[in-house]
Amino acid sequence: MNTVLDIVLHAPDAEGLQRARMNAVNALRAAPQTQVRIIANAAAVEAALNTPHPQADALTYLCPNSLNALGRTATAPLQVLGEPAVLALARLQKHGWAYIRS
């Protein structure tokens, strides 16, 4: 099956971020043409900042509200969403991305 998939992995906490990272790496290994985004909010934002992941950080988008609440800034390759995570998740789903809560 050669269908290109767009997958958004939602990580709301540290454990979810760990699962999302593993799922992203596994999905891309099995189907390199897949588009994968990890959207981290709440406790997952702090986990992403504190625990770098060379394979998944470039795919990881942080909620600006969670980042501001922590009083921290993100460094590349981590990216910051241009809107709250809840809106980004809804927008991606509206555009056909498959949502998976990690």
Where are these regions (language model features)?
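Secreted/extracellular ectodomain signature
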Residues: 1-102
